[in-house]
Amino acid sequence: MILGFIGTGKIASSVITGICKSNLKYKKIIISPRNKQIAKSLKKKFKKIVIAKDNQQIVDESTWVFLSITPAVGEKIIKDLKFKSSQTIFSFISTITLSQLKKAIKVKAKIVRAIPLPPISLKKGPVPICPPNSKVKAFFNHLGTTVEIKNEKSSINFWSTSGMMAPFYEMQRVMSDWLVKKGVKRNNAQKYITSLFLALSEDAVIHSKENLRELVKESQTPKGLNEQGVNELSKSGFYKSLEKTLNSIYKRLDK
């Protein structure tokens, strides 16, 4: 199997890295020359990487084609590429729907929308896919945990929550910077905060079959620090603002 990636940004680079670190079997990975620095770096790291001369070469030579480009670039270039009906085409594009992709691609190829995030480079994290596909599910299970979504409308919910990645990191940055202002060395501050969030996230995953309200409750003691923290953030509208932002992202995606 030959894998082809159109786009070599952060997501594409992360998926490619995860694939190369996995035990997946493939002949080679053909990547876009667009971001020369990332393309050359990937080729230097992994021996099965080939840099294409253009996007059409990627389509011509690949069994599976991954579209990892911005919506604006996607709208501009996809319609001019000549795909084959025998191919499986993956779209990581947030705002282009399956029906729009089918219209632009023109041939009756298998098209799957997927939502990988940067931790896929570590073979960690969920990968929602729509529509369900057994081969695609098996593929992404080598790189994380595949979540199959039958309804594209429902997939918008997952796309919306993927917009919380930068806010998650921003919260850690704010807390790390606060420690630095208090005299803690940056390396120590960032190591502590990121390790804290990792441990809390792992604990949440272990208890993910329970209502997360229980974790919120169990992490507080009467008049304790965590009770103060959650109450003050609630009063400030922090959590309502979080939900409002999710709704705003959802509306943008729900065309």
Residue ranges and their predicted role:
Residues 1-53, 57, 177-181:
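NAD(P)+-binding Rossmann beta1-loop-alpha1 motif at the extreme N-terminus of oxidoreductases
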Residues 4, 23, 82-83, 104-105, ...:
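Solvent-exposed alpha-helices and their adjacent loops that cap or buttress functional pockets
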Residues 15, 30, 36-38, 45-129, ...:
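Rossmann-like NAD(P)(H) cofactor-binding subdomain of soluble oxidoreductases
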Residues 39-40, 120-124, 156-158, 228:
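A short acidic, helix-capping loop that chelates divalent metal ions and anchors anionic groups
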Residues 100-110, 125-159, 163-207, 248, ...:
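Internal alpha-helical scaffold of NAD(P)-dependent oxidoreductase catalytic cores
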